[in-house]
A protein has these predicted regions:
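Structured, active/binding-site neighborhoods that engage oxygen-rich ligands
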Residues: 1-227
Length: 227
């Protein structure tokens, strides 16, 4: 069942991914979880590094900065801190939310651990808490949808969860925008999901950066919707 659900999310994610980087990183995440039988930050970091040193593309500037520093010998956590400082703390991107969604499909990992794991995974590259909380929000939405809730029921459930209700409230106040700020990416993705917007129109809105369609694809897959 874990393979079935994680593969379902991967398939949806890939349908929203016009470039390919998020799909490759999500596959690496799944490979690490399967190999370690759970989330292992050190193992995943090594796998992300190996990809960076070989076939990496479409990673985003934060990921690129962090792993460039690691290659030069910087401690991984220090590389994240340095990047956060060099970027004037502007590391609230959507990369973690893109790549981490399939985590929800590993039913052997309890729902009670998903938020913490998503935040830890985000910290491999993005220090800003919005990046981790946004990723955790996507993962929890996917898990609740897989458990049979509707999208609206899922949002209502999360609005009562102490660890996620604040980030969800902030997302609802964000903007419909094609930029990569995680709150705007999630606002836009939720808007298109609720409006049942065809993917071609979502792609047109997103433009070449293609930020929100990846989230739309992951969530729609968990809703068992046809693309």
């Amino acid at each position: 069942m874990a393979d079935e659900n994680s593969n379902l999310i991967l398939k949806g994610l890939s349908k929203g991914d016009q470039i390919g980087g998020p799909t490759q990183l999500a596959k690496i995440l799944c490979e690490s979880i399967k190999s370690c039988k759970s989330f292992d930050k050190d193992d995943l970091t090594k796998r992300y590094l190996k990809w960076w040193q070989n076939d990496a593309f479409d990673t985003g500037p934060t990921y690129a900065s962090v792993f460039s520093k690691i290659v030069m010998g910087t401690d991984p956590d220090e590389a994240v801190r340095q990047t956060h400082k060099e970027f004037d703390q502007n590391t609230a991107g959507c990369g973690p939310a893109h790549r981490c969604a399939p985590l929800a499909g590993f039913m052997n990992i309890p729902s009670t651990r998903l938020i913490s794991i998503a935040r830890q995974e985000a910290l491999i590259t993005h220090q800003h808490p919005d990046a981790g909380n946004g990723s955790a929000l996507v993962v929890m939405i996917c898990r609740l949808l897989l458990e049979g809730l509707s999208f609206q029921e899922t949002l209502k459930n999360i609005s009562n969860q102490p660890e996620l209700k604040t980030i969800l409230s902030r997302v609802k106040k964000a903007q419909l925008s094609p930029d990569g700020y995680i709150l705007n990416v999630l606002f836009s993705a939720f808007y298109f999901i609720e409006e049942q917007t065809p993917m071609d129109k979502v792609f047109n809105f997103a433009g070449s950066p293609n930020y929100c369609p990846v989230i739309v694809g992951s969530i729609r897959a968990c809703m068992k919707l046809k693309f």
